[in-house]
From Swiss-Prot:
The lineage of its organism: Bacteria, Pseudomonadati, Pseudomonadota, Alphaproteobacteria, Hyphomicrobiales. The keyword GTP-binding applies. Mg(2+) binds at residues 13, 40. GO terms for cellular component: cytoplasm. The active site is at 13 (proton acceptor), 41 (proton donor). The gene is purA. It comes from Rhizobium johnstonii (strain DSM 114642 / LMG 32736 / 3841) (Rhizobium leguminosarum bv. viciae). This is Adenylosuccinate synthetase.
Length: 432
């Protein structure tokens, strides 16, 4: 038995929600370790859809413990609203099935406002990143700047006032520079005191809780949000998120040691998508790109934004295999490729007349690369709902084998529809 870390191996939206839900049935604890409420996913259980963006997937399953780790930035209002939506669907959320790290950073209204002001200013100058305007980046900035308000601070109103003073010294200086009205001390105090009683019951010393559970032999599933190529260090900077999304963050963002992480499962879509700005070497701006977007329902859960679509990029996924230490992948949305006469896979790039096997880190070089493709024959038969290799067309199996060979990692799971049980299990990550 081992613990499992789930990471996205592309730009997010790889189908992590379904795979995490599939695995969470067998886990005891599901841990979120980075990001905020900027990356959503939909779980379908017994025909009911649950939309989550901050809460770990385990929260909708009876008998499971969901944990929000210290690496997550928590918007208390978004948290309360999400709990309310789940309770309206009959899901009970109490400290018996949800714990939040007492040292997790809080997202405040001033973070959301700063995020939006920056994006508006950047839109006018052509340097827009394409954030969700939810305050994620500014909250992480305050965390690194050592001025953040954390969950534990809600329990100590006597010292909270001084911490609010410190954060406002920074933010009001920024607001004056942007020509925006300053935020009052009382407004932030009111904002925090209004949510304290709803948030504090869930707080815990998460590293200690997880260590005790590990020693008891509990199965722990670490749930990543977004994807490797949005990692602040290893992604397509500056068009990235504000946290580390690679598997190593599961340790830092939860308080578990790296030796406890176990199997690293990379969720990998059978084609490529991206939301927002930034380089995308295999992007298809033609009828095939439209086909993938329509058939794959490529619209963001949180923002509703249309995703950009393109061919599978083996060179990028190879990089993700390396930077995460991925043990095996879960290949998702194979069924979206049904009916295409031919399929292409990017195996490398041409850059200024030279062939390279990885995407360079330089923004300028990323914009100049041209993908090198191999072409495979497609298949006409449907793969929707396949639950064994015998259910798959020969060409679909050939495509999967080609992907494995090109990325240098085996397929552990193969997903053939949004339904949880439409999954071909090759290797059980929990038993590896």
């Amino acid at each position: 038995m081992t613990n499992v870390v789930v990471v996205g191996s592309q730009w997010g939206d790889e189908g992590k929600g379904k795979i995490v839900d599939w695995l969470s049935e067998r886990a005891d604890i599901v841990v979120r370790y980075q990001g905020g409420h900027n990356a959503g996913h939909t779980l379908v259980i017994d025909g009911t859809s649950y939309k989550l963006s901050l809460l770990p997937s385990g929260v909708v399953r009876p008998g499971k413990m969901a944990v929000i780790g210290n690496g997550v930035v928590v918007d208390p209002h978004a948290l309360i609203a999400e709990i309310g939506r789940l309770e309206a669907q009959g899901v009970t959320v109490t400290p018996d099935n949800l714990r939040i790290a007492d040292n997790a950073t809080l997202i405040l209204s001033l973070h959301r406002e700063l995020d939006a002001m920056r994006e508006d200013a950047a839109s006018n100058s052509g340097t827009k990143i394409g954030t969700t305007r939810r305050g994620i980046g500014p909250a992480y900035e305050d965390k690194v700047g050592r001025r953040a308000i954390r969950v534990m601070d809600l329990a100590d109103l006597d010292s909270l006032s001084g911490k609010v003073d410190r954060i406002l010294t920074h933010h009001n200086a920024l607001r004056r520079g942007l020509g925006v009205a300053e935020v009052s001390h009382q407004a932030i105090m009111d904002e925090l005191t209004s949510v304290a009683d709803r948030v504090l019951p869930f707080r815990d010393t998460v590293w200690l809780f997880l260590d005790k559970e590990r020693r008891k032999g509990s199965r722990i599933l670490f749930e990543g949000a977004q994807g490797t190529l949005l990692d602040i260090d290893h992604g397509t900077y500056p068009f990235v998120t504000s946290s580390n999304t690679v598997a190593g963050q599961a340790a830092a963002g939860s308080g578990m040691g790296p030796g406890s992480l176990g199997y690293i499962l990379g969720i990998t879509k059978a084609y490529t998508t991206r939301v927002g700005e930034g380089p995308f070497p295999t992007e298809l701006k033609d009828a095939i790109g439209e086909f993938l977007g329509e058939k794959g329902h490529e619209f963001g859960v949180v923002t509703g934004r249309k995703r950009r679509c393109g061919w599978f990029d083996a060179a990028l996924v190879r990089q993700s295999i390396a930077t995460n230490g991925i043990t095996g992948i879960a290949l998702t949305k194979l069924d979206v490729l049904d009916g295409l006469e031919e399929l292409k896979i990017c195996v490398g790039y041409m850059l200024d007349g030279e062939q390279i096997d990885h995407l360079p880190a330089s923004q300028g070089a990323q914009a100049r690369v041209e993908p090198i493709y191999i072409t495979l024959e497609g298949w006409k038969e449907s793969t929707v709902g396949a639950r064994s290799w015998a259910d798959l067309p020969a060409q679909a199996i050939k495509y999967v084998r080609q992907v494995e060979e090109l990325i240098g990692a085996p397929v552990a799971l193969l997903s053939t529809s949004p339904e949880r049980d439409d999954t071909i299990l090759v290797t059980d990550p929990f038993e590896d």
